Amino acid sequence: MDWNKFRLLRATALAMTCGVLLSILTTCSISYKFEGGSINYDKTQTIHISEFPNRTPNYPLLSQVFDLALRKRFIEQTRLREVSSNADIEIEGEITNYQLTPQAVRDGDFASKTRLTISIRVHYINNKESNKDVDQTFSAFRDFDSAQALESVESDLVKQIVDEIVDMIYNATVANW
């Protein structure tokens, strides 16, 4: 009989413990949202992103690739509506650098790696909160094997670099990182 009471008490204690833990877990939650973290949507609802001209003689498609990636990021990850004029936020700038430099030089002055660097100057203007304006140049690079022809890796490298620069711009302007 004592054994049955013990099992009953043990089962009751276990059920109560599980109930308490379950109620704690269902009532407590932590939510992180990194999209448009510093935008005050009560004041700011529109954005205009100008075309970024490519001031370098290389990779003529760079301007289009960058413009599309930047627009996509801001339109998909914020609640801002794109307009052609009188925007609350304006983003403009230019592609200032597209450079290939030798890396890891070895015997006979031959570089086993080549570095592709892209730099983009950005002017971010918040017409509702001017203290959040940003005027900065963002750069990123990727290294590739010098035995590979640039033409065979260029579009993939450009996409990777552009994605990284767009991340940096987004984080420096609206994500508040």
Locate predicted features.
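Soluble non-cytosolic domains of exported or imported proteins
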Residues: 57-65, 111, 115, 151-164
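A structural "domain/chain start" motif
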Residues: 26-71, 79, 100, 128, ...
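Surface-exposed short loop/turn segments
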Residues: 76-81, 88-133, 141-152
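A cross-taxon signal for low-complexity, glycine/charged-rich
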Residues: 1-4, 10, 15-19
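C-terminal/domain-edge helix-coil "capping" segments
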Residues: 126-129, 144-177
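C-terminal segment of classical bacterial N-terminal signal peptides
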Residues: 18-27
